[in-house]
């Protein structure tokens, strides 16, 4: 029997002066040991003009069709206030995750893909 594959979008965090894409180990362990599934980490794909095409539904749908679920994890970063119409200053936003996850959620829900969310992930949902 094959194990289900669960997609986990990464945060973008600075380590020194370099950006890294990462997911908290507790979320990877929850998928692996708690759910008995295989975690697949998805980088936030960076920024720049060439990245926009990667975020289109025509690019995201084949990726989401290849997995059994989407897990929107918690994070120390916050969603940028522009996403929910606030003019409050952003504290530790992760704009790359925002760009990826909001489009992933729309596509996943349109496809009927199971989505599990905690903390920041629930706010994204």
Where does each model-flagged region fall?
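N-terminal beta1-alpha1 cap of cysteine-dependent amidohydrolase-like domains
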Residues: 1-120
